[in-house]
Amino acid sequence: MGLDPDTEAAAITAALRTLAPELTTVPMIKTSRPFYGARVGDLRATAAGWLRAHRDATPAELAELADRLWTTGVREEQLVACFLLARDRAALAATGLDRVRAWTALLDNWETTDQLGMNVLGPLVALDPGRRLGLLEELAGDPHPWARRLALVAATRLARADDPARWWPAVAELLLRLAGDRQAALPKASSWVLRSWLEPCPDQVAAFVDANAGRLPAVAVRETRAKLATGTKRPPRPPGGRRPAIAGGRP
């Protein structure tokens, strides 16, 4: 007998309520979504425990369970959905891009957006960038600002794909397309993308930042140049003084 995703989703919901039993809309982060207030570490442990207890679950069943959890719109259930898929590569591969695209309708804060991008969409696109990069381009043009942020966060994981240098030009175009966007903390997300790509493509990223310093967000230019120079996004603070400013970018 196969796994019933509705029953399993209800069991996970019950477990999450015991971690933080009062459903609340008072935000830990700026969100209109309900949440229980459970810690991220407990959510990861919940996902890991479920997988240990259901080793016979098929990839399709796990993908369906993740969908049930995500579409509740509750923070903890959405994050458990991400962590389930992140721990099971076959289930991730069984999660269609159309399904993840539909999930973006429930994004309204940086936490769930970033967890979806890091754990699900980014790794999913990295499995087959040639066929799947188009979704990031589509999301970059979405009127929903959190969908646009999702495109950038997912691009950080493409730096781990096979032959990453092949995909850098597409990521660079994505960055330029969103360079002037100030919604959903997109300037900081641009910095994250650039710094993620320094490991596989340091020369290309450095040249890109130099060539486009006037277009890219100032924080992205500053933090990327700092990481190139020091290994961290923040320049070292001199004894008794402020950290030096790094030239480039818009004021």
PLM region descriptions:
Residues M1-P251:
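Alpha-helical scaffold domains
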